[in-house]
Amino acid sequence: MPKPALRRVMTATVAAVGTLALGLTDATAHAAPAQATPTLDYVALGDSYSAGSGVLPVDPANLLCLRSTANYPHVIADTTGARLTDVTCGAAQTADFTRAQYPGVAPQLDALGTGTDLVTLTIGGNDNSTFINAITACGTAGVLSGGKGSPCKDRHGTSFDDEIEANTYPALKEALLGVRARAPHARVAALGYPWITPATADPSCFLKLPLAAGDVPYLRAIQAHLNDAVRRAAEETGATYVDFSGVSDGHDACEAPGTRWIEPLLFGHSLVPVHPNALGERRMAEHTMDVLGLD
């Protein structure tokens, strides 16, 4: 190609590249700025199942609450990028939403406000010590009976269920109404409790969970009633109920480490027995995010 022609091609190429660069720069300068996704203002309420009591590491902010920084609220916040205020506290009852549970521990509802976007909670299991008493009574009866019969059911009958219906259920509803009043714009998720016992007795589990064979389904039915009370209270107050009855089946305290979400009463790997382990807290977070459509 003659030199004058070559120079013309090079000149045209440089001009074209320059025009393209100017065009991109101009387009970039006039493009609408990307809209950042708003950060969720997330408040976690609840008892030891929410706090992850027994799961390491422990939050040093308040050792009385035995709150883990690997609990399901932290997993949700880490996954979604939410701004977390975690006021969960081991042994909390619904009454602790409006009263100081310990000196220096404010009522849990004080953490809520009109700017709160998301609230999660697991609560009700400690109210009137009903469910704790059921586990303790049935465990003691199981040891004394050598695992035979249904001594706990025979002695207590419907008393635990009656207590849940008469006291726990209305207290749950009142607590959720309190959440709604303090955080009127928030999405509220009330979590059920993952299964502690299998559906039927497993003789190989007796040393870990010393329940008489006939009391295993009895205690599971009491837990099902507690979860149903949470469900009804949630539905009647506009909250979302997160049901664990299906996804936690086969992950109870009788299962092997790595499969179970709940640690057994005896010979477990957690500081707090009959509570979720680290795997359980992660699975609770994952299922809650699935139900709420969070990612």
Curated annotation (Swiss-Prot):
Entry note: thermal dependence: Optimum temperature is 45-55 degrees Celsius. The activity drops quickly at temperatures below 30 degrees Celsius.
GO terms, molecular function: carboxylesterase activity; triacylglycerol lipase activity
Active site per database record: S48, H275
InterPro entries documented for this protein: SEST-like (IPR037460), SGNH_hydro (IPR013830), SGNH_hydro_sf (IPR036514)
One GO location term (cellular component): extracellular region
Biological process terms in GO annotation: triglyceride catabolic process
Alphabetical keyword list: Disulfide bond, Hydrolase, Lipid degradation, Lipid metabolism, Secreted, Serine esterase, Signal
Any Pfam family the entry gives: Lipase_GDSL_2
Functional pH dependence: Optimum pH is 8.5-9. Active from pH 8 to 10. Rapidly loses its activity when incubated at pH in the range between 6.5 and 11 for 24 hours.
Signal peptide from the UniProt entry: 1-31
Disulfide partners: C65-C89, C138-C152, C205-C254
Organism domain of life: Bacteria
Catalytic activity: a triacylglycerol + H2O = a diacylglycerol + a fatty acid + H(+)
Gene3D superfamilies: SGNH hydrolase
Enzyme Commission (EC) number: 3.1.1.3
Regulation of catalytic or functional activity: Strongly inhibited by Ag(+). The cations Ca(2+) and Mg(2+) do not significantly reduce the lipolytic activity of SCO7513, whereas high concentrations of Co(2+) and Cu(2+) partially inhibit it. Is not inhibited by DTT in vitro. Is resistant to PMSF inhibition, except in the presence of Ca(2+).
Principal localisation: secreted
UniProt-annotated location(s): Secreted
Family: Belongs to the 'GDSL' lipolytic enzyme family.
General function of this protein: Catalyzes the hydrolysis of fatty acid esters with a preference for long chain fatty acids (C16-C18).
Subunit structure: Monomer.
Protein name: Lipase 2
